[in-house]
Amino acid sequence: MNVLLIFLGCGAGGVARYGVSNLMYLLMGKQFPIGTLIVNITGSLLMGILFIFILERLSGNIQLWRSLLLIGFLGGYTTFSSFSIETFNLIEAGHYFVAALNVLLSVALCIAGAWLGVLIGRQL
């Protein structure tokens, strides 16, 4: 059952990532990997919220919710591999400052998003 929930969640998360990334690139252009950055920040925020909510607020079989939402949906939604290749491509193109900015913003804002999500989750 857990494998099926992970499969379904991951598929939905991947479709959501595709939609959000493409919307960001459409609105803001592709000079900076904003689509991946926004996806990873919002995914980190949701991870914090849902992690606390599932652990502290839900009763019953929390493993099912964890499999569907945390491992499945957010695993399919967030993307370290896209972040990595986009940063590599920036470096290879000689855009060292933009690559460094991408790394700094991604790490700092994703950690901040997870922290904020935990705070929000505790208030629910």
Curated annotation (Swiss-Prot):
One family name in Pfam for this protein: CRCB
Reaction it catalyzes? fluoride(in) = fluoride(out)
* Transmembrane parts of this sequence: 3-23, 34-54, 68-88, 100-120
Topology class, membrane = Multi-pass membrane protein
GO molecular-function terms, A-Z = fluoride channel activity; metal ion binding
Q: Does the keyword Transmembrane apply?
A: yes
Name its cellular compartments.
Answer: Cell inner membrane
Q: Coiled-coil region(s) at which residues? A: none
Keyword annotations for this protein, in alphabetical order, are:
Cell inner membrane, Cell membrane, Ion channel, Ion transport, Membrane, Metal-binding, Sodium, Transmembrane, Transmembrane helix, Transport
Q: What top-level branch of life does the organism fall under?
A: Bacteria
Similarity field: Belongs to the fluoride channel Fluc/FEX (TC 1.A.43) family.
How is this protein named in the record?
A: Fluoride-specific ion channel FluC
Q: Which organism is it from?
A: Coxiella burnetii (strain CbuK_Q154)
Taxonomic lineage of the native organism: Bacteria, Pseudomonadati, Pseudomonadota, Gammaproteobacteria, Legionellales
Q: Which gene encodes it?
A: fluC
